[in-house]
Amino acid sequence: MMQSFENVTVVKKANRYFDDKVTSRTVIFPDGSKKTLGIMLPGSYEFGTDKAEIMEILEGELEVFLPQESKWRTLRGGESFDVPAHSRFSLKVNETVDYCCSYVG
C-alpha cells in the first residue's frame, strides 16, 4: 500500500455524504486517474458505484456487504476490498475509518 502520492492535484472542495458523516477529497494523478482520501464516522451506509472501486482501509474497522458475497465481512486497517462497477454495497462502520478509494477503469 502506497504511503504517499507525488505530482498530483488535490481538489480542495470536499465530497460530503450522509450528513457529513462520510467525507473525502479527490486526488487526480498525471495520467488522469483518480482516488479519494476520506474519513467515515461510525454508522451504516449504502453506496452505489459507476466504476469499479478498490477500497483500502488505512485505519479503523468496518463491516462490508458486497453484491457478490452472501455475508458481512469485517475489515481493519491494512485490508482492502473490491467493488464491481454499476453495483451497490453496504457498510457498517464500527469506529472512525480512514480510507483510500481507487477508481478502476
Swiss-Prot record:
It is an enzyme of class 2 (transferase). It catalyses: a purine D-ribonucleoside + phosphate = a purine nucleobase + alpha-D-ribose 1-phosphate; adenosine + phosphate = alpha-D-ribose 1-phosphate + adenine; cytidine + phosphate = cytosine + alpha-D-ribose 1-phosphate; guanosine + phosphate = alpha-D-ribose 1-phosphate + guanine. Pfam families: Ppnp. Its EC number is 2.4.2.1, 2.4.2.2. GO terms for molecular function: guanosine phosphorylase activity; purine-nucleoside phosphorylase activity; thymidine phosphorylase activity; uridine phosphorylase activity. SUPFAM superfamilies: RmlC-like cupins. Keywords: Glycosyltransferase, Transferase. PANTHER family: PYRIMIDINE/PURINE NUCLEOSIDE PHOSPHORYLASE, PYRIMIDINE_PURINE NUCLEOSIDE PHOSPHORYLASE. Belongs to the nucleoside phosphorylase PpnP family. HAMAP family: Nucleos_phosphorylase_PpnP. Catalyzes the phosphorolysis of diverse nucleosides, yielding D-ribose 1-phosphate and the respective free bases. Can use uridine, adenosine, guanosine, cytidine, thymidine, inosine and xanthosine as substrates. Also catalyzes the reverse reactions. This is Pyrimidine/purine nucleoside phosphorylase. It comes from Wolinella succinogenes (strain ATCC 29543 / DSM 1740 / CCUG 13145 / JCM 31913 / LMG 7466 / NCTC 11488 / FDC 602W).
